[in-house]
Amino acid sequence: MLKTNVYDMSGKLVGEIELPEAVFGITPNESVVHDVVKNHLANVRQGTQSALTRAEVSGGGRKPWRQKGTGRARQGSTRAPQWTHGGIVFAPKPRSYSYSLNKKAKRLALKSVLSAKAAESNVVVIDSIHMDAPKTADFAKFLKAVGCDTKTLVVTAAADQNVVKSGRNIPGCQVTFANVLNVYDVLNAGKLVVDQAALKTIEEVFA
């Protein structure tokens, strides 16, 4: 049974909650986590690199000098790869690096990293995360009050734009939503700050 304290946004202890064991209490599978992180990084890769082959570089139609009699090595074009301004051998072209992984693997990886965070006591539960207006200073004060002023991932149940705007200018802070939680973001954060509504959504979606 995984129990943890619940705090309000001022850092005051308001109760206790049981973390769902199906999500926060499994034995982490490092191999699957590695596969899913690799997949995530490949999927977000731009793949826009591009260079010209010798067939695509402008110019080079004229033979630079005659074939024989100069004492120099024979050359057919000034756009051959060994020349300055020549084409690139096996020039990279724009392509997609993305590939798919099955949902079971992604779900297991997420539960693994959430369980690791819980085992390290790096999951902080808040009764409700809300902001009446976008205020970065107030949000920073809240994070400090709950002991999360380092690299922090804040997870809410709904897309509250006031919370998003309040957190986006704080170095090391990222705000995301429970239904789109991913392995890379959780791994990249030192602390996980979750409100009770988000905790319920995580259990419903990923358990």
What are the roles of these predicted feature ranges?
Residues 4, 8, 18, 40, ...:
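Exposed boundary/loop context
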Residues 30-68:
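A short, flexible low-complexity segment enriched in Lys/Arg and Gly/Pro that occurs
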Residues 1-46, 91-207:
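Extended polybasic, low-complexity segments that bind anionic RNA or targeting/receptor surfaces
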